[in-house]
Amino acid sequence: MTTEIKKLDPDTAIDIAYDIFLEMAGENLDPADILLFNLQFEERGGVEFVETADDWEEEIGVLIDQEEYAEVWVGLVNEQDEMDDVFAKFLISHREEDREFHVIWKK
């Protein structure tokens, strides 16, 4: 018997990702990127819920079921409203009782 996973709504996934970003950015981003983010976030900052990519296995070394995870990006958007400077990509489990996440930080 398969149990249905209640998926995160986009706003909740965004909140979780942004909270993790704020908590961990200082340890994982270059100081210049942190400064850039802080200076420009009010004007150009974005936290976007995106379609879960199929290349996470390459990034984290674990095969994932795209239906069980939400993907959120944190970064800066350009004049065309496209996120062109991604500081972190989050993969967040929809499972509330076992909320795991993976992060790919800007290098």
Swiss-Prot record:
Gene3D superfamilies reported in the protein's UniProt record: dsDNA mimic, putative
Signal peptide positions (record): none
Family assignment from sequence similarity: Belongs to the putative dsDNA mimic protein family.
Role of this protein: May act as a double-stranded DNA (dsDNA) mimic. Probably regulates the activity of a dsDNA-binding protein.
Listed Pfam families: DUF440
Name of the protein: Putative double-stranded DNA mimic protein CGSHiGG_01135
NCBIfam families: PRK05094.1 (NF003469)
Lineage: Bacteria, Pseudomonadati, Pseudomonadota, Gammaproteobacteria, Pasteurellales
